[in-house]
Amino acid sequence: TLTHYQAARLKPLFESLHVSTKEDKFGGEFALILDKNDGVFSPMVALASILENFKDSYVFCLSVDAPFVEEEQIKALWEVAQKTPNSAIIPRDLQTRHPLCGFYHSSLAPLARQLANEENHKLGFLLQKCGATYVDFKDSKPFTNLNHPHEYEESLKNQSLV
């Protein structure tokens, strides 16, 4: 699965790796962070649940369906995080921002939870409120999402994923 692929390649880059999910469907293979709002499928709920598990630290978040983000992009974001007081460091390419990839500081947990409780599930709103820092990338390919099974299959055929 994409989860296994992402975990295997990203684990060496971090002190710890956690999988955010609504329920344990991995049979104990991963350290999990379970979403705290049952029945609500939202990146804001997931982000709040994730950040509530950490204290005074940046947490790198990446959607499982973005398998082309590599160490190079992660390091570029981390370098900016080390130099700025901002609580969110997010990649941006020529087309758009990528809020499902980036470093979020754990101090954002209360704001993320508040927005989730208010049913405001747009990460862009959180990023606006916290004054996120955007890191520009010329190449958009690393931030491509595989939103459908056929996109995943096509990537396998093209050997984009190995």
Regions found by a protein language model. Name each.
Residues T1-N120, F125-P142, H150, E154-K157:
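Nucleotide and nucleotide-moiety/phosphate-recognizing core
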Residues N158-V162:
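Terminal amphipathic alpha-helical/low-complexity segments used for targeting or macromolecular assembly
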